């Protein structure tokens, strides 16, 4: 012990050998001294090490406190910046929007008016989504904002004071939801990759088709015997429930993929790719069953009419898709804007006109086929069109989920109906989980990965909100009370499926992903190498 102290003292007092004495050399010498003092007695920190740690801690805390003070000064400055500036700006925009519409429409934009209700619902849905996004749990993905939008609309409808002043006509509500459905279908069609379609493995096909079809058939069976729906309406309900939600699955998969979980087996890629095909299959089945349910005549005629709607939708979509591949041509100005307007305008026209001409199931198929063929021809420009359509979706997403929530009234719900709807959703989801597990067997996944994929294929949201109210809107256009009751049951089940499965599915993916999926080994090695390099430096 004494020899070591003498050696340390000698090294500290050693004279310079002609080299320039710099602060960095002094820091290195000080760090070596502290390390050697630690080596003498590793269990008890020395006074020097304690002082060094406290000084480092103060240096780390000082910039943080300075940042908070600087932000506060910017916020309270004149003119203000930061949070206060954003709040004032957003409030001004909201008030200005209302004032401009009021100056044009008058009483329609006052409390109780139609436009007033739409504006209030729109901003309340946005605020609801933002508030839900503030709920952050450690090591878990954030809750989907669409859930906050859904709850905002539900609260507006079921709080008497607010409901008396926020009134939206059924025709306006139906039209806005149909526009949102058109945007979703365009995004789904453009999102399909023709090269990926050719390279799809059997497991991706099984995953996109098997659970959707089995859940649709199970839900139809349950709806017929538990809810008393006719078989046509049972399958409408089944295909509403059969779709998985990309709005929940894709962000969660991207988080896991960024962390390196399941990348080696391609689990996130598989789920994101199969999700699009799962949704398209559900929408196609829904449109076909919708056409059959609202057609009159014999069963054979209804089935043939459903097939005819599919043929009309595919044929019309093919013609329009090839048309907008070449018009406008690539040498025109503002090419992306023109293509975006054409694909959105034609999709909205297809959805509305199909209902007008008595073929409600053909509009959605027409939009899907048209967007897919247009995207194949646009190649590199497709991404720019998708960006603009994503902005349109950001505008209509709060309206869609807010309007879906506002359709559900507690006063009109019977307790036994709610219980049967929850039972239908629960049993159908359980069958879907088991079917998904079977579909990924013999695909090279281990038991933990199969369990994760089964639970990750659970969330429902976007498609249920988009098509869940279409049957009710179509029933209202026919003016039959019994059909409206069937449509209300379908909408209630869709609402409950979003409310139950969206948060549970998101939490399960965040909890089970790091525990059941393997992390890529080379990422860990890279981190270790980087750590060793930083220590050596």
UniProtKB/Swiss-Prot annotation:
Compartments in which it is found: Cell membrane; Mitochondrion membrane; Endosome membrane; Recycling endosome membrane
Membrane topology label: Multi-pass membrane protein
Transmembrane region(s): 87-104, 114-133, 145-161, 172-189, 201-227, 234-242, 271-290, 301-324, 340-357, 362-373, 391-411, 418-440, 462-473, 487-509
Listed GO biological process terms: clathrin-dependent endocytosis; flagellated sperm motility; lithium ion transport; positive regulation of osteoclast development; regulation of insulin secretion involved in cellular response to glucose stimulus; sodium ion homeostasis
Subunit annotation: Homodimer; dimerization is essential for SLC9B2 activity. Lipids seem to play a role in the stabilization of the dimerization subdomain.
Source organism per UniProt: Pongo abelii (Sumatran orangutan)
A Pfam family of this chain: Na_H_Exchanger
Highest taxon above the source species: Eukaryota
Region spans: Disordered: 1-33
GO cellular component: apical plasma membrane; basolateral plasma membrane; endosome membrane; mitochondrial membrane; plasma membrane; recycling endosome; recycling endosome membrane; sperm principal piece
Stretches of the chain found on the membrane's Extracellular side: 105-113, 162-171, 228-233, 291-300, 358-361, 412-417, 474-486
UniProt GO MF annotations: identical protein binding; lithium:proton antiporter activity; metal ion binding; sodium:proton antiporter activity
Residues noted as binding Na(+) in the record, renumbered to the chain: 244, 275, 278-279
Disulfide bond annotation, renumbered to this chain: none
Keyword terms, alphabetized: Antiport, Cell membrane, Cytoplasmic vesicle, Endosome, Hydrogen ion transport, Ion transport, Membrane, Metal-binding, Mitochondrion, Phosphoprotein, Sodium, Sodium transport, Synapse, Transmembrane, Transmembrane helix, Transport
Comp. bias intervals (Basic and acidic residues): 1-10
Modified residues (Phosphoserine): 49
Activity regulation description: Allosterically inhibited by the N-terminal domain. Inhibited by phloretin.
Residue ranges that the UniProt entry lists as topological domain Cytoplasmic: 1-86, 134-144, 190-200, 243-270, 325-339, 374-390, 441-461, 510-537
Function noted in UniProt: Electroneutral Na(+) Li(+)/H(+) antiporter that extrudes Na(+) or Li(+) in exchange for external protons across the membrane. Uses the proton gradient/membrane potential to extrude sodium. Contributes to the regulation of intracellular pH and sodium homeostasis. Also able to mediate Na(+)/Li(+) antiporter activity in kidney. May play a physiological role in renal tubular function and blood pressure homeostasis. Plays an important role for insulin secretion and clathrin-mediated endocytosis in beta-cells. Involved in sperm motility and fertility.
Protein name: Sodium/hydrogen exchanger 9B2
PANTHER family recorded: PTHR31102, SODIUM_HYDROGEN EXCHANGER 9B2
Additional record remark: The subcellular localization of SLC9B2 remains controversial. Was initially thought to partially localize to mitochondria. However SLC9B2 does not seem to contain a mitochondrial targeting sequence. It was later established that its localizes predominantly in plasma membrane or intracellularly to endosomes and lysosomes. In another recent study, endogenous SLC9B2 in the distal tubular cell line mpkDCT4 is detected in recycling endosomes but absent in plasma membrane.
Record's keyword annotation contains Zinc: no
Listed Polar residues bias regions: 15-27
Enzymatic reactions: Li(+)(out) + H(+)(in) = Li(+)(in) + H(+)(out); Li(+)(in) + Na(+)(out) = Li(+)(out) + Na(+)(in); Na(+)(in) + H(+)(out) = Na(+)(out) + H(+)(in)
